[in-house]
A protein has these predicted regions:
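C-terminal non-catalytic regions of proteins with extracellular/luminal or membrane-system context
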Residues: 1-216
């Protein structure tokens, strides 16, 4: 189990959306309740984005000993917040650098993503599978472990389109606005309406999701 989000989950938004949770589950605390043999748990990276070679080294040493790496990563509280515009759609570089390095010593990586909105995913190839927990609330860790261990059938579907590149989004050419007034020039062509109409390839389409069942 690797990643700062396994210890301090990103389970809600910030600003006026923040609530005082009665009890917050974490991956590190909850995983012992499941039929998983845990080799160890380390943070691996700094949540704030700084490079920490000692944490990275500990993560690599742990990954070598494990059959499967559960890598918890995503956008921190300052990357997306009320009243702040995101200037890009990337996961912090130190997290992705660790993911790439982990893949060199253990290719069996399950990426457990936490973010409140769409992100670029050029790092997808380094994960054997990806579980997106979004902002799962105070009981999000247990819910994700239920999916990972097969206790429940994964049946969630994306409620937004994940583009291949930020430059592919309809607002890219006029965002952020240079004046006090923001112009929503997309009109009705937002989200899947734009990508479908303009025939722009995407990473994952609106409504994408998997389950253990095949329907015909």
């Amino acid at each position: 189990l690797i990643g700062d989000f396994a210890f301090v989950p990103r389970y809600q938004g910030t600003g006026s959306s923040m609530v005082n949770a009665t009890q917050v589950e974490t991956m590190e605390q909850m995983i012992g309740d499941y039929s998983v043999m845990l080799v160890g748990a380390v943070s691996g990276y700094c949540r704030s984005g700084e490079v920490d070679e000692a944490k990275k080294k500990a993560a690599l040493e742990l990954a070598v000993r494990a059959d499967v790496v559960l890598f918890c990563f995503g956008l921190d509280e300052l990357s997306e917040s009320e009243g702040l515009d995101r200037t890009h759609m990337r996961i912090p570089e130190n997290q992705i650098d660790l993911l790439k390095t982990l893949a060199q010593v253990n290719p069996n990586i399950v990426g457990i993503l936490s973010a409140g909105s769409a992100v670029e995913m050029p790092w997808e190839k380094y994960c054997k599978s990806i579980l997106h927990g979004y902002l799962g609330g105070q009981a999000g860790a247990g819910a994700m472990l239920n999916v990972l261990t097969g206790c429940v059938n994964p049946s969630g579907h994306l409620n937004e389109t994940y583009p291949l590149h930020y430059e592919d989004t309809p607002a890219y050419h006029h965002f952020p606005a240079g004046e006090r007034n923001a112009q929503y020039r997309e009109g009705i062509y937002i989200g899947y309406r734009y990508y479908d109409t303009a025939k722009v390839p995407v990473q994952y389409p609106f409504g994408y999701g998997l389950s253990y069942t095949t329907f015909e």
